[in-house]
From Swiss-Prot:
This is Fibrinogen beta chain. It is found in: Secreted. GO terms for biological process: adaptive immune response; blood coagulation; innate immune response. A long coiled coil structure formed by 3 polypeptide chains connects the central nodule to the C-terminal domains (distal nodules). The long C-terminal ends of the alpha chains fold back, contributing a fourth strand to the coiled coil structure. It comes from the Eukaryota. The keyword Disulfide bond applies. The keyword Disulfide bond applies.
Length: 9
């Protein structure tokens, strides 16, 4: 999953 990398807030 790449979501965490893009939205790493």
């Amino acid at each position: 999953n790449q979501e965490g990398l893009f939205h790493g807030r």
